A protein has these predicted regions:
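Carbohydrate-interacting regions of secretory-pathway proteins
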Residues: 22-209
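Serine residues within intrinsically disordered or low-complexity segments
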Residues: 2-4, 26
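C-terminal motif of bacterial Sec signal peptides marking the signal peptidase cleavage site
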Residues: 18-19
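Intrinsically disordered, low-complexity segments enriched in polar/charged small residues
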Residues: 14-15, 162
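Sec-dependent signal peptide recognition
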Residues: 5-14
Length: 209
């Protein structure tokens, strides 16, 4: 699992598992972020080696993982992802909160306040140095803009970098399929649940809706 760039993730990510060996679900939640460090996380920024945290892009502030562009003059397609690698998960329920804040550094409208969680993600150790996004299925976060140039303003959309996704028996016709969510403004925490059943079913839930 990886987290793509350009957002602030609040305090912790919690995850509940179904045992890979048993059909009995676990009610125990596991914190993926300790609120103090990036222990257990691996950074990959396009054009740089694994764990080269170029310009201190990923930092911990106020018990949150912050994606910071304070030291950037231009973006130059330096897409970044941060991967949780302590354990692999197959059947799980992921909970997190995110928000967008601050000014935007990118020029492309498609990328404006654009982030997400990359599910079924490619191993960061197998990603090419200049590769911008891991092969994955993305639960995409967008924020704070009613009239985007690409026409999509909802959050928790489904995007498919390098993958084909079957929705109700049909391969998704577009790279990104929009959700039915409302538009969430910047500087507002948004609660997200993503429920994954092996390689077959993914549920996206926003603010328990």
């Amino acid at each position: 699992m990886s987290i793509s760039d350009n957002f602030l993730k609040k305090i912790f990510i919690l995850l509940t598992l179904s045992s890979c060996q048993q059909d009995v679900a676990s009610n125990d939640w596991t914190s993926l972020f300790d609120g103090k460090s990036l222990d257990g996380w691996e950074i990959k920024i396009a054009g740089y080696d694994l764990n080269d945290n170029y310009n201190n892009t990923y930092v911990v502030e106020d018990e949150s993982i912050v994606v910071s562009y304070d030291s950037y003059d231009t973006f130059d397609e330096k897409d970044g992802n941060i991967f949780y690698t302590k354990k692999k998960f197959k059947n799980y329920h992921l909970k997190l909160e995110y928000k967008f804040y601050g000014d935007h550094i990118r020029d492309g409208d498609w990328s404006f306040r654009n982030s997400g969680v990359m599910l079924h993600s490619e191993d960061p150790y197998k990603i090419f140095k200049d590769q911008r996004v891991p092969v994955s299925i993305e639960a995409q976060f967008l924020g704070g803009l009613e009239n985007r140039a690409d026409g999509i303003s909802t959050t928790l959309n489904m995007c498919s970098p390098g993958t084909d996704v079957d929705i109700n028996g049909t391969i998704a016709p577009n790279h990104c399929m929009r959700s039915s969510s409302k538009v969430f403004p910047i500087n507002e925490w948004v609660g997200i649940d993503v429920i994954v059943y092996s390689d077959s079913i993914v549920h996206h839930i926003i603010e328990r809706d």
